[in-house]
Swiss-Prot record:
Record protein name field: DNA repair protein RecO
GO cellular component assignments: bacterial nucleoid
Function: Involved in DNA repair and RecF pathway recombination.
Superkingdom of this protein's organism: Bacteria
Family to which this protein belongs: Belongs to the RecO family.
Keyword terms, alphabetized: DNA damage, DNA recombination, DNA repair
This protein's record includes keyword DNA repair: yes
A Pfam family annotated for this UniProt entry: RecO_C
Keyword Phosphoprotein assigned: no
Length: 238
């Protein structure tokens, strides 16, 4: 078995004396793990940094085997090492892809959007794009939010809240006495105008709630990844 693909490195761990096991998110083969022979060597180890864009060739005797990668660097994202917020964003993306995606299942649209987001992390103003990316993650888990109309009245006007149970929008008038039990709906989630820092934080509280709920069987009682919590902490200070 053999294939060639492009992917971003999600994680790396040492394997034996000189090799490494990497996990990558690829364009056509999804989240995939494999051994890199000599991955702990001085020559290859510097290439294997989270977020690095790689040209990958995977080989295995049988498809169900872990197999081995040969890697060639396409793009390094080590510039983010000097940017605390950008690095936190990169780590959150890698961690969320790891816990969200089944192994070896292609998600081509998410892959394209993830690469665009990773490329944006060294420029200011990327947090709203991260919020939109988490919305896409929810869709990939099969639970996209429905913010097009009020769940109670069907109206498209005056949408002000999100139900924490259904993920559907609720208008201000329909919320009534339940308003304090609902999430405020930031305009950023509706794609209306530029997103303020507060709207991004509100939006991520919503996506975090539903991602945590939908991923609960995979997390086995654990919270969402610490890398995401670290990003939320830094955004709260911004």
């Amino acid at each position: 078995m053999e294939w060639r693909d492009e992917g971003a490195l999600l994680s790396v761990r040492r394997h034996g004396e000189s090799s490494a096991i990497i996990e990558v998110f690829t364009a056509a083969h999804g989240r995939h793990a494999g051994v890199v022979r000599g991955g702990a060597s001085r020559k290859i180890a510097p290439i294997l940094q989270p977020g690095a864009q790689l040209d990958l060739t995977w080989k295995a005797r049988l498809d169900e085997h872990m197999g081995a990668f040969t890697v060639e660097p396409l793009r390094s994202r080590t510039a983010l090492l000097g940017d605390r917020l950008g690095l936190a964003g990169l780590n959150a993306i890698c961690a969320m892809l790891h816990v969200t995606l089944p192994e070896r299942e292609p998600h081509s649209t998410l892959w394209q959007e993830s690469m665009v987001l990773l490329d944006a992390l060294d420029r200011p103003g990327w947090p709203p794009a991260y919020l939109r990316w988490e919305m896409r993650l929810l869709e990939e888990t099969g639970f996209g939010l429905d913010l097009t109309r009020c769940a109670v009245t069907g109206s498209r006007e005056d949408l002000a809240f999100v139900s924490p149970k259904t993920g559907r929008a609720v208008s201000s008038g329909a919320a009534g006495g339940w308003a304090d039990r609902l999430f405020p709906l930031p305009l950023a989630l509706l794609g209306q105008g530029p997103a303020s820092a507060e709207e991004v934080r509100q939006g991520l509280a919503i996506t975090g709630h539903f991602l945590g709920r939908e991923l609960a069987p995979l997390l086995n009682g654990r919270p969402l990844p610490e890398a995401r919590a670290r990003l939320m902490e830094l955004l709260a200070r911004a």
